Structure formats: C-alpha cells, structure tokens
C-alpha cells in the first residue's frame, strides 16, 4: 500500500495563516506566537550573528508589518513568519495538529526547516540545543500515542550537524533524515571525477549507529547547496571556496567541457556562495545533447543518469525519486515568463510532469 507523508512546517506559518491574521488585528495572544518587535533594537542585535538564508531574493531576517507596527522575524521569506517556541502554546498547538493528522491516517511526518526553530540572541539561531529538546519531546509523544508513525527530518546543514538529529539510542529524535551530504558528494564527484570526498562521506555513514537511517536521493524540489565537509577538503588539499565555485559553475554550464545545463540560485558575491538548480537529466547532459542534436552526447547523458541512480540506490537507506526523474524530464524554462517566480530558479525543476 501507500503510506502518506506530509510536511509539518515547524519554523513558520504564512502571513495569511489564521494566527498571523489575528496577530495583525492586534490580538496579543497571537502576536506572542511570533517574534515581533516595536523597534529595531533587538532585530539589529539578531542581525549581527544571524546569517541570511536568501540574501539575494529575501535579504535580512525581519519584515515590517504595517498592520501591527512591528518588525516580525522572517528567516526565509517576508510572507513566512517565524514561530516563537519560547511560548509553550506554540509547541502544544503544533503537537496537537500532528496528532490530529496521525489520527487521520498520516504515517510519516517530514518536519521542515527544523534546525531553525529556536532563536537566541548572540547565536546564529541554527542547531541550538533547544531544537533537539523540542524534537525529542515530539518523538516521545508520538511513541506514546502513535508508535507506528515515522518522523523524518529535513536538516540541510553541514555534514557534522546531521547525525545529532537522530539523537541517541536512549534518547532518539528523528527516525530518518535526508541524505543531503551523500547527494552533494555524488554530484561533486560527477563534476570533478574525484571520488575521495564521496568515499569519505560513505565511510562516515557506515560508522554511524544503526539507528541512523537516511533517505537517499539525487534531486528534490529544492536547490543543491554545496555544503561539503570543509575540514576534509583541506585535509585533501582542496580549497573549499574554489571547489564550490568550480562546482556551481560546472553545473551552470560555464565551462566549454561541461555537459550540464543548470542555473545558479542565490549567488552571493561577497561570500562567493551559490546553489545549483536543474533536473537530473539536464545536469547529466541529456538536455545539452538533445539541444545540439548530438546523439552521442544524449547516450552519454543517459549513462550518467543511470550511474548516478545506481550509486544512490546502492547506499544503505530509503530511496526517493523526484517527480520527473523516472522519465528523464529536462529543465522547464517557462517559469521565467511568470513575474511572480521569475527570480526563483528552483522553478527550473519544479515543472509539471510531462
């Protein structure tokens, strides 16, 4: 049968959500469910240590709300208001919603953006100890009420930050995590023809306890963020910044020898950070070969796709296919015709299934 998996967006609600609407009306109970400030004093303190997730498309971590005359914490986009887990009502409401959905038959919950849910001044507001306390409480309650339900964590962080989200055998947290580091290292190995970083990543995974179970994938609805293990890169005498620049330019198709056709996402000229977008088929060379009418390039692209999927499926864990990968779907550039999403290159691989 089919087990239904639903997203639980732990970090924020839309600004059109009932809570946000009531907060805009000035209802204090609902204003307290977000982090709202009358002046820039505290927001400016947060900004000193809190990185920006989308510096190009959504700069800053706060948004002015005219209705409330408050600055609202918005880590991701201005229309996504961060929840205030310092207020226990937020956790209680969240677990109530999860249990309601579990009672309706949902068997897997994908907890979204979980590393960001706890905020403290003077920190980067990511991966803080309180985050793990909240996930642990969530797991404990699910095990008591609906022990068959699976908790899947979306933790897109540096490799060293991932294992702790499984918790320990005595105090478990997530049942499963996305294999982000494995995915990134697969694509890096394809571009550089250097498997040393990938081998290191496999060694790390095989050294983890048996309770660490990953969802393995090549592509998803989001970008590829080049979060490689910088310490290991340095040990291998690889410059992390130059390596990252090479990778995102390779998959953008900048180099004449590159077979990929992708686009950059959120390029930051200061840090030289950028992410890559595109479907598996386009990043592996099928689109380029087809556009140029080169059958040999297409065949090589198909072989790359098969090799990448074979490598992914050989890893211990649960395999996930992104919609369109099963038919070799290429990039869809029509998103650029829509002014609402034209600046978001992730829609390059978020097309209709066809």
Positions of the model-derived regions?
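Active-site and adjacent substrate-binding regions of carbohydrate-active enzymes
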Residues: 1-354
């Amino acid at each position: 049968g089919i087990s239904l998996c639903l997203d639980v967006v732990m970090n924020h609600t839309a600004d059109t959500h009932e809570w946000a609407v009531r907060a805009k009306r000035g209802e204090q109970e609902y204003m307290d469910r977000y982090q709202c400030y009358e002046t820039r004093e505290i927001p400016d303190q947060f900004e000193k240590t809190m990185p920006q997730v989308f510096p190009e498309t959504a700069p800053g971590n706060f948004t002015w709300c005219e209705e409330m005359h408050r600055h609202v914490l918005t880590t991701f986009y201005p229309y996504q208001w961060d929840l205030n887990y310092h207020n226990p009502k937020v956790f209680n409401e969240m677990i109530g919603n999860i249990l309601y959905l579990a009672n309706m038959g949902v068997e897997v919950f994908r907890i979204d953006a979980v590393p960001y849910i706890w905020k403290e001044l003077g920190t980067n507001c990511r991966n803080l100890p309180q985050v793990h306390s909240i996930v642990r409480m969530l797991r404990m309650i699910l095990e008591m009420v609906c022990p068959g339900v699976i908790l899947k964590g979306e933790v897109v962080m540096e490799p060293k930050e991932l294992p702790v989200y499984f918790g320990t055998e005595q105090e478990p947290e997530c049942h499963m995590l996305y294999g982000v580091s494995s995915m990134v290292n697969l694509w890096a190995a394809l571009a550089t023809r250097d498997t040393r970083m990938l081998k290191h990543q496999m060694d790390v995974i095989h050294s983890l306890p048996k309770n660490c179970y990953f969802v393995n994938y090549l592509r998803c609805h989001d970008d590829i963020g080049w979060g490689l293990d910088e310490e290991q890169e340095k040990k291998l005498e690889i410059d992390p910044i130059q390596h990252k620049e090479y990778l995102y330019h390779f998959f953008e198709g900048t180099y004449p020898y590159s077979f990929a056709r992708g686009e950059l996402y959120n390029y930051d000229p200061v840090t030289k950070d950028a992410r890559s977008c595109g479907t598996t088929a386009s990043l592996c060379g099928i689109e380029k070969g087809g556009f140029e009418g080169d059958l040999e390039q297409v065949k090589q692209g198909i072989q790359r796709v098969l090799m990448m999927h074979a490598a992914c499926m050989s890893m211990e864990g649960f395999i996930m296919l992104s919609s369109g990968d099963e038919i070799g779907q290429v990039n869809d550039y029509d998103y650029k015709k829509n002014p609402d999403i034209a600046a978001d290159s992730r829609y390059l691989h978020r097309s209709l299934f066809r």
